[in-house]
Amino acid sequence: MPKLEMMLLVLLIFPLSYFIAAGGQVVQVDRRGDGLAGYLQRGDRDVQDCQVSTPGSKWGRCCLNRVCGPMCCPASHCYCVYHRGRGHGCSC
């Protein structure tokens, strides 16, 4: 088998092993440093998207619990409610 064909075959098989090792789920490698957001959004965690501090910035606040308005709820069983005159808040 020529070298080029062998390299192409290896390149085709190599990513497949990662796919199988992950249990058949697509594994997305994040090389920009936003891996924490991807980690928090996996599984059955009750995680909302990170809130961006300033428009155009990738920095913000990530919560392990539900995001409600500008804050994170203190526990995973809390949910976000709207209080008339006071705005949004967590109800636990």
Curated annotation (Swiss-Prot):
N-terminal signal peptide: 1-24
PTM text: VxXXA stands for the form with the Pro-55 hydroxylated. A second major form has both Pro-55 and Pro-74 hydroxylated. The two major forms VxXXA and [hydroxyPro-74]VxXXA exist in a 1:1 ratio.
Propeptide: 25-45
Cellular component GO terms, alphabetical: extracellular region; host cell postsynaptic membrane
Tissue: Expressed by the venom duct.
GO MF term (any one): acetylcholine receptor inhibitor activity
Residue numbers bearing the 4-hydroxyproline modification: P55, P70, P74
The keyword Disulfide bond belongs to this UniProt entry's keyword annotation: yes
Major localization class: secreted
Compartmental location: Secreted
S-S bonds: C63-C72, C68-C80, C73-C90, C78-C92
Keywords, sorted A to Z: Acetylcholine receptor inhibiting toxin, Disulfide bond, Hydroxylation, Ion channel impairing toxin, Neurotoxin, Postsynaptic neurotoxin, Secreted, Signal, Toxin
Keyword Cell inner membrane: no
Known partners and oligomeric status: Homodimer or pseudo-homodimer. Three dimers exist: homodimer of VxXXA, pseudo-homodimer of both VxXXA and [hydroxyPro-74]VxXXA and homodimer of [hydroxyPro-74]VxXXA. These three components exist in a 1:2:1 ratio.
Free-text domain note: The cysteine framework is XX (C-CC-C-CC-C-C-C-C). Displays a mini-granulin fold, a structure composed of two short, stacked beta-hairpins connected by two parallel disulfide bonds. This newly described fold is derived from the same cysteine connectivity as knottins (ICK fold). The name 'mini-granulin fold' comes from the structural homology with the N-terminal region of the human granulin.
Physiological role: Alpha-conotoxins act on postsynaptic membranes, they bind to the nicotinic acetylcholine receptors (nAChR) and thus inhibit them. Through its two C-terminal domains, this homodimeric protein would bind to two nAChR allosteric sites, located outside the nAChR C-loop of the principal binding face and at the adjacent binding interface in a clockwise direction. This toxin specifically blocks mammalian neuronal nAChR of the alpha-7/CHRNA7, alpha-3-beta-2/CHRNA3-CHRNB2 (IC(50)=370 nM) and alpha-4-beta-2/CHRNA4-CHRNB2 subtypes.
Family membership noted in the UniProt record: Belongs to the conotoxin D superfamily.
Annotated protein name in UniProt: Alpha-conotoxin VxXXA
Origin organism lineage: Eukaryota, Metazoa, Spiralia, Lophotrochozoa, Mollusca
